[in-house]
Amino acid sequence: MIKDTTFGNKDGFEKFGKSFQEKLCKLIMFDRPFADQMEEVLDVSFFENKALQELTKLVFRHRTEYSVHPSEETLETLVRTEISELPESVQATIRNFVAKAIGNQVVADSDYIKNQALDFCKKQKLQ
């Protein structure tokens, strides 16, 4: 189940930085087994950026509704059709991020990012 806190979370991914958070979102988008693990422990408010929060929720919502991870094509369609209620700046950020991510799915340091993110989320969940 996706957790979403309205007021954000001081104890989020801020300390890891923007690049880490973008790579983490990219891994959730394209690495189904990793997304399975993260869906159990991730509070999307851990992301500093509203666009990354909304994109992650979009992926998880699709997985919940259809019991399958979205393909690249489905993800592009979801971005075109499911984010219209968001502010235009957030929509533009999501569209740009997804286009760049699909163009280059390689994530440097993916094992490190996966381990750090899972460890962090599990520790937060225990608090």
Regions found by a protein language model. Name each.
Residues M1-F120:
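Noncatalytic partner-interaction/assembly domains of nucleic-acid and motor enzyme complexes
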